[in-house]
Curated annotation (Swiss-Prot):
Its cofactor is Zn(2+). GO terms for molecular function: deacetylase activity; hydrolase activity, acting on carbon-nitrogen (but not peptide) bonds; metal ion binding. The record marks 175 as: Transition state stabilizer. The modification N6-carboxylysine is found at residue 173. Its EC number is 3.1.1.-. Esterase that catalyzes the deacetylation of acetyl-(R)-mandelate (in vitro). Can also hydrolyze acetyl glycolate, but with lower efficiency. Has very low N-acetyl-D-amino acid deacetylase activity with N-acetyl-D-serine and N-acetyl-D-threonine (in vitro). Theoretical substrate docking studies suggest that other N-acetylated amino acids may optimally occupy the active site and may in fact be the physiological substrates. Homohexamer, dimer of trimers. The lineage of its organism: Bacteria, Pseudomonadati, Pseudomonadota, Alphaproteobacteria, Hyphomicrobiales. SUPFAM superfamilies: Composite domain of metallo-dependent hydrolases (SSF51338), Metallo-dependent hydrolases (SSF51556). Keywords: Hydrolase, Metal-binding, Zinc. This is Deacetylase Atu3266. Zn(2+) 1 binds at residues 75, 77, 173, 289.
Length: 407
């Protein structure tokens, strides 16, 4: 049984969702307000207006809220207990409107078995993972770098780990910045790409403080690969401070390299995102890079991250696509015919509301969000989980290996 998918269990009560407005289901799908009946087996039983339902049905009046395919967060860290930065899936999953979580390299080949047993298998959300190229993954993130030299990579064990976990592992993850690789530069990206080719899976590369250069990374990647932190504002790694880099990123995106937001504590800039989008360069996917050092400040959750992109003029429909169909394609998750009778229910019910919320990017720049994505329910099979945005707690000054920071 894969995570987020039920084995043979007793039937639950049916669910009737009324007055929902479909969005993000692809060309040709109806966008008219409708009702959806989900059977006790978790599969869609009927779609239409004024549906009849059994007496024991759980009835949810969405009051005109949107319904989309279940949201996918392509970049989180949820190996809780196995790394020093990971959070629990429950902190960023269904209760935040997200039905599929993709862990971005928290586990390496040496500890993926624990991640599978203690996190993936018990989770009600669907969980997939990019396997870290470094054997230890993010056990002590940035304190014990996972890619210092070639001794940190074991090709044979990576191949073996993938063979044993191919239903869970969707690609390889490489963090390519000097905090991790030091003077090793772009070499880990080259090694990772070679292994990804052998496994026939995509690679996700974290770009940040050079070396490696963002430019070098893009030149190595190919169609289907992912560059995360695409709109970071770091010196030497911002696509808006170097016209050649912007043009390269634009060309690579056109060729099928996936630009992923990966907000995180240090990797999203309002200014960079606004300038890039104004020039027509949109991110392929919107993800959070949620972990213990970024959740309370500045990220919060996927809905708020989506709202940030909306605030810098990314169109509503593109924002929805960037958390549904687009990231789903990276992990080979079929998004076709999601509203057809007989399909397993996997939805997010949400509103888009007027607001006046102060939000911060990773550089400390502030923007006021005038429109907010507000998740209401995550529907996973025959379970409708009430959802809401994360409400941050009061921040505190925390000492860590590099000094102090607000969290």
């Amino acid at each position: 049984m894969t995570s987020g998918e039920q084995a043979k269990t007793p039937l639950q009560a049916p669910i009737l969702l009324t007055n929902v407005k479909p969005v993000g289901f692809g060309k040709g799908a109806s966008q008219s307000s409708t009702d959806i009946l989900i059977g006790g087996d978790g599969k869609i039983a009927a779609v239409g207006s004024a549906l009849q339902a059994p007496a024991d049905t759980q009835r949810i009046d969405a009051k005109g809220a949107f319904i989309s395919p279940g949201w996918v967060d392509l970049h989180v860290h949820i190996w809780h207990g196995g790394t020093d930065i990971s959070i629990r899936p429950s902190e960023c999953g269904a209760e935040r409107g997200v039905t599929t979580l993709v862990d971005a390299g928290s586990a390496g080949e040496a500890n993926f078995h624990g991640f599978r047993e203690y996190i993936i298998e018990p989770s009600r959300e669907r969980i997939k993972a990019f396997l870290n190229l470094g054997s230890i993954g993010l056990v002590a993130c940035n304190r014990v770098p996972e890619l210092r030299d070639i001794k940190d990579i074991d090709l044979d064990r990576i191949l073996e780990c993938y063979a044993e976990n191919s239903e869970h592992i969707v690609g390889l993850k490489v963090r390519a910045s000097h905090v991790i690789t030091g003077s090793w530069g772009v070499t880990p990206v080259k090694l990772g790409k070679k292994i990804a080719k052998i496994l026939k899976v995509p690679m996700m590369v974290h770009v940040g403080e050079p070396p490696a250069l963002y430019d070098e990374v893009l030149e190595i990647l190919g169609p289907g690969d992912v560059v995360t932190h695409c709109f970071n504002g770091k010196s030497g790694s911002s696509i808006m401070e170097d016209e050649d880099l912007f043009n390269l990123a634009e060309r690579c995106a056109g060729e099928g390299i996936r630009l992923d937001i990966g907000h995180g504590g240090a990797s999203f800039s309002f200014k960079v995102a606004e300038a890039a989008i104004a020039r027509g360069l949109l991110p392929f996917s919107i993800s959070t890079d949620l972990h213990g050092h970024s959740m309370n400040f500045p990220v919060w959750d996927l809905a708020t991250t989506m709202s940030k992109l909306l605030s810098v003029d990314m169109p509503f429909e593109n924002v929805v696509e960037a958390v549904t169909r687009n990231p789903a394609s990276v992990i080979r998750l079929d998004m076709e015919n999601r509203l057809d009778v007989g399909q397993r229910a996997d939805f997010t019910v949400f509103d888009l509301v007027d607001a006046d919320l102060e939000a911060t990017d990773s550089n400390g720049d502030v923007s006021r969000l005038k429109r907010l994505f507000e998740p209401r329910y995550a529907v996973i099979g025959a379970e409708a989980i009430a959802a809401s945005r994360y409400i941050p707690r009061a921040r505190k000054l925390v000492r860590h290996s590099h000094g102090y920071s607000w969290r």
